[in-house]
Amino acid sequence: GRVLEVSIGPGVNLPYLVGRADVGEIYGLDISLGQLKRCREYVAHQGWDVQLQLGNAEQLPYQDNTFDGVFHLGGINFFNDKKKAIDEMIRVTKPGRRILICDENEKGAQAYERVIPGFKRIAGKLRPAVVPPTDLLPPEVREVRLFNVWKDWMYCIEFTKA
C-alpha cells in the first residue's frame, strides 16, 4: 500500500520500508529543507522511488483518505499544535488503516539532556514533562495501544482510523 512518513528527516527509516511486500508507494514529508535535501541525496544514491515533499505536519498537503499507513517517529513533542498534526495524520489515512506516532518519553528526554549538548537549551530549561499525547486522539479512533520502545526512551501510540 501507500505509506507516508511525517517528518522523514534524512530518511533513516526508509530501509525498513523499501522492498517490503506490503509497501507499494512511499511518501515522505518534512518541514526542513536541509533534511529533505539529505533525504533526496540518500534516496538517489540508493536508487529508491520515494516521493518527498516539503511541508508542515499540521497542514499536510495530501487529499483525505490517501494513505494505507501513516507514521511519525520523533518530533511531535516540539510541534506547535500536536492535536492538529494528529488530526491531519488521521485525515490523510484511509479508514480502517493504522497510524503510528512515536517520540521520546520523559525518560528519553532526561537521557538526551545528559548526553546531547544543547538538547536542554532546545527543549527549554523549564520544559513541561513529556507525556504521550493520547488525550489528543479523537474518540472515534479504535484499537489504541501505547507502548515504549528503544530502551524505554520512546513512547509509541498506535491506533486505527475508524
PLM region descriptions:
Residues 68-81:
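A short SAM/SAH-binding and catalytic strip from SAM-dependent methyltransferases
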Residues 20-21, 79, 93:
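A generic alpha-to-beta junction signature in SAM-dependent methyltransferases
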Residues 2-59:
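Class I SAM-dependent methyltransferase SAM/SAH-binding core
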Residues 58-70:
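A short acidic, Gly/Pro-enriched loop at the edge of an enzyme's catalytic core
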Residues 83-95:
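A short glycine-rich, Lys/Arg-flanked "PGG" loop and its adjoining helix->strand segment in the class I
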Residues 30-31, 81, 104:
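Short beta->alpha hinge that forms the Motif I/post-I loop of the SAM-binding pocket
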Residues 100-158:
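C-terminal alpha-helical "lid/dimerization" subdomain adjacent to the S-adenosyl-L-methionine
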Residues 2, 97-98:
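Short glycine-centered segments of the SAM/dcSAM-binding site in methyltransferase folds
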